[in-house]
Amino acid sequence: MFLNKRKAIFLISVPVLIFILTINQAKSQIIKIVDGDTIHLNGEKIRFTGIDTPELKQTCLKDGIKDPCGVTAKQILIDKIANNNVECTSEGKDQYKRTLAECFVNNESLSSYLVRNGYAFAYRRYSKKFIPDEDYARINKIGMWSMDFDYPWDYRKSKKN
């Protein structure tokens, strides 16, 4: 009887263990942070919709001192994602064939997080969704709102000329 109980426990345990390992493997992701508003998720290039972050080479001025605000925006995203899984809701593709999406970590929008922390702007040309987050950061002088800066779209335009 004792042997049969051990055998039964073993026969039940093995499938349960395999199931748990399968779930953990399914959740593993390969994430590369390109910049503040672009990631590669399992090889797919994803551009966050509704926001725009400073370019990596872009700097801001705080009390007359250059601040690498583009690099800081990327680092804030790296820190927020850390070792968490990222879930994205696709909204189609852009002209560069990137997936346009809003992405989340622990059910929190990464776009909202970046805008609210003052290192992304509501990209009003495409969406009004993140304007309240931007207003909050601006009113409270959070992140780039405590500095002199060029909007990313103005910075890109100045580099084309």
Which role fits each region the language model picked out?
Residues 2-161:
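Small beta-barrel nucleic-acid-binding modules, primarily SNase/OB-fold domains
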